[in-house]
């Protein structure tokens, strides 16, 4: 009988970008097992100018990345709404959310909000309550302090799930 290789846990950070609150969630994925590591949010003061808020988000994420040392990152894609200015500002926060891990040499994946919901809940139009219920099941030790931190954990779970599928497809293809 051939010995099975030891599967090393991979640490993943999920990031839910926002100008008021950027959520982050760190998990470890080992095979199909998920382990909660930590979560929270970066909240720059509302009265700061835009550039200073973006800097605060970057500095906050850089501290989280240094403290938790994830190997991979996942960021939620921005949805376009009717307010073009708000969408552009959210896009700037998202740029910071992608830049911070990249500056640490961490690969960054992107997932659409509906893809996150479908992966975690099974329905692409799930609400925040349904996500919270599934987080309790998938990560029973997690107690996210905000909806943004919960969303970030869901993004990390989505990445863990999709990276496993990608690894399996590569194995089947002999790569």
Curated annotation (Swiss-Prot):
Keywords assigned: Cytoplasm, DNA damage, DNA recombination, DNA repair, DNA-binding, Endonuclease, Hydrolase, Magnesium, Metal-binding, Nuclease
Keyword Magnesium attached: yes
Its EC number(s): 3.1.21.10
UniProt-annotated binding residues for Mg(2+) 2: 76
Any single biological process term in GO: DNA recombination
InterPro entries to which the protein is assigned, alphabetical: RNaseH-like_sf, RNaseH_sf, X-over_junc_endoDNase_Mg_BS, X-over_junc_endoDNase_RuvC
Reactions listed under catalytic activity: Endonucleolytic cleavage at a junction such as a reciprocal single-stranded crossover between two homologous DNA duplexes (Holliday junction)
An annotated Gene Ontology molecular function: DNA binding
Record's subcellular location: Cytoplasm
Cofactor, free-text remark: Binds 2 Mg(2+) ion per subunit.
Residues that, per the record, bind Mg(2+) 1: 16, 148
GO cellular component: cytoplasm; Holliday junction resolvase complex
A Pfam family matched in the record: RuvC
Positions of the catalytic residues: 16, 76, 148
Cofactor(s) named in the record: Mg(2+)
Family: Belongs to the RuvC family.
HAMAP family per the UniProt record, alphabetical: RuvC
Function recorded in the entry: The RuvA-RuvB-RuvC complex processes Holliday junction (HJ) DNA during genetic recombination and DNA repair. Endonuclease that resolves HJ intermediates. Cleaves cruciform DNA by making single-stranded nicks across the HJ at symmetrical positions within the homologous arms, yielding a 5'-phosphate and a 3'-hydroxyl group; requires a central core of homology in the junction. The consensus cleavage sequence is 5'-(A/T)TT(C/G)-3'. Cleavage occurs on the 3'-side of the TT dinucleotide at the point of strand exchange.
Complex and partners: Homodimer which binds Holliday junction (HJ) DNA. The HJ becomes 2-fold symmetrical on binding to RuvC with unstacked arms; it has a different conformation from HJ DNA in complex with RuvA. In the full resolvosome a probable DNA-RuvA(4)-RuvB(12)-RuvC(2) complex forms which resolves the HJ.
Name of the protein in question: Crossover junction endodeoxyribonuclease RuvC
Organism in which the protein naturally occurs: Bradyrhizobium sp. (strain ORS 278)
Encoding gene per record: ruvC
